[in-house]
């Protein structure tokens, strides 16, 4: 049970820290943290939680990571569904707290602001198409899993995995925030989409399908190509 609670708490922190920075701080007058700050915030949530709960649950915080690690032979089948449920619950609680905080500002419009929801077409920050969003999310999540698999490989330098994984997530956000607002995490997308409703819910399917496909691809590529012992 501890590992499921850890995943819920960890995903809670990822959503509150990452989406919270986007909603509350990104465009704050004069001292807003901007795109770079939001990207760094997401990376820092994973970095801090990896040290806090990595030894308890592995610090997945993401259904695409859980399914990817399972596909890569690094995770037990019986824990896949409970992990995903815990991640979604933790994210939704964080989304609710963020909603309460954000709507405490006079005139705040959840739907109009986007509430850090992920989207494509007219709801993409840069007006990118559904195809562009699909490709971006698949490729970014694929690379995320390759980094996770490599950084946690027993042959990798020990103790540096949280840093590599956190920085990778920061880089992913720097690349793809303009395209989809960056998901690579179905729990993160669900956590805010449920409070926006409307278009965010109707487009949510892409932010489940693409990250999971990308996660499986990345894990399988690492397991079968990059992760094999070399005879050279």
From Swiss-Prot:
Protein name: Aquaporin Z
Highest rank taxon of the organism: Bacteria
Key words, A-Z: Cell inner membrane, Cell membrane, Membrane, Repeat, Transmembrane, Transmembrane helix, Transport
Sites marked Selectivity filter: 42, 173, 182, 188
Topology of this chain in the membrane: Multi-pass membrane protein
GO MF annotation, one: water channel activity
Transmembrane segments: 8-28, 33-53, 84-104, 130-150, 159-179, 201-221
Gene behind the chain: aqpZ
Organism classification: Bacteria, Pseudomonadati, Pseudomonadota, Gammaproteobacteria, Vibrionales
């Amino acid at each position: 049970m501890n590992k499921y609670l850890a995943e819920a708490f960890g995903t809670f922190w990822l959503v509150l820290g990452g989406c919270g920075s986007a909603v509350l701080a990104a465009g704050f007058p004069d001292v807003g943290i901007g795109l770079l700050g939001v990207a760094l915030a997401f990376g820092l949530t994973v970095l801090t939680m990896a040290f806090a709960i990595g030894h308890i649950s592995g610090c997945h915080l993401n259904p695409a990571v859980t399914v990817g690690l399972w596909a890569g032979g690094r995770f037990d089948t019986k824990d896949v569904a409970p992990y995903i449920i815990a991640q979604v619950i933790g994210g939704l609680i964080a989304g609710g707290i963020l909603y309460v905080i954000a709507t405490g500002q006079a005139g705040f419009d959840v739907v109009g602001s986007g509430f850090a929801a992920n989207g494509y077409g007219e709801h993409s920050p840069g007006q990118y198409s559904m195809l562009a969003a699909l490709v971006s999310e698949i490729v970014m999540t694929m690379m995320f899993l390759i980094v996770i698999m490599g950084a946690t490989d027993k042959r990798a330098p020990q103790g540096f995995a949280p840093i590599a994984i956190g920085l990778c997530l920061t880089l992913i956000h720097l690349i793809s925030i303009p395209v989809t607002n960056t998901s690579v995490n179905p729990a993160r997308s669900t956590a805010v989409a449920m409070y926006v409703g409307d278009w965010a819910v109707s487009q949510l399917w892409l932010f489940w399908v693409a990250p999971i496909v990308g996660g499986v691809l990345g894990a399988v590529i690492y397991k079968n190509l990059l992760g094999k012992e070399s005879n050279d």
